[in-house]
Curated annotation (Swiss-Prot):
InterPro entries assigned to the protein according to its UniProt record, in alphabetical order: Cupin_1, RmlC-like_jellyroll, RmlC_Cupin_sf, UCP019307_cupin, YjiB-like
SUPFAM superfamilies membership: RmlC-like cupins
Transmembrane regions listed in the UniProt entry: none
Protein name: Uncharacterized protein YjlB
UniProt domain Cupin type-1: residue ranges: 28-139
Gene behind this protein: yjlB
Length: 165
């Protein structure tokens, strides 16, 4: 199957700020061999990786972007807050989540597993949309550094071609 990308832009919903400029980028069929996922993203400059599931509540990272790669099975992940999009996510798919974009697992198979990583290995923060975290989070979202490379291709495209116009 050929890799396909889709983009989704989410406006600030009052609770989850989302990113003011960058869309979510979904890569369907990103990797044929998910066993190589960590090696691939690390080689492309994305590290501080972890594997597990996605939290079942809305959260976001204000200080960094994030890549998620579905390693095993499938899930439906909601991006962009309560009014966002519910996107099917299956083994081999990937998504680059801009700083500030909310995400939560709506449903999954019992052994659904993802790999998460961050450009330059940034130590990510965890925000849940509480009013007292918003002002600082909005500032940090705008300051989150652009990654040097696309985590899947290791090149400028497609991620930076989409984000930098």
């Amino acid at each position: 199957m050929e890799r396909e990308t889709q983009t989704y832009f989410f406006p600030d919903d009052g609770r989850i700020p989302n990113h003011p400029d960058f869309p979510l980028v979904v890569y369907q069929n990103a990797l044929k061999d998910t066993g190589l996922a960590e090696r691939i993203v690390t080689r492309h400059g994305w590290s501080n990786s972890w594997s597990g599931s996605v939290f079942p509540y809305h959260h976001y990272h204000s200080n960094t972007h994030e890549v998620l790669i579905a390693l095993r099975r499938e899930a439906v992940i909601q991006f962009g807050g309560e009014k966002g999009a519910a996107i099917p996510f299956k083994s081999g798919d990937a998504v680059v989540i801009p700083a500030g974009v909310g995400h939560k697992k709506l449903s999954s198979s019992p052994d659904f597993t993802v790999l998460g990583a961050y450009p330059g290995g940034v130590q990510y923060d965890m925000k849940t949309g509480k009013p007292n975290e918003r002002e600082e989070a909005v500032k940090q979202i705008k300051q989150a550094a652009l990654p040097a490379n696309d985590p899947i291709t290791g090149k400028r495209e497609p991620l930076l071609e989409i984000w930098v116009k």
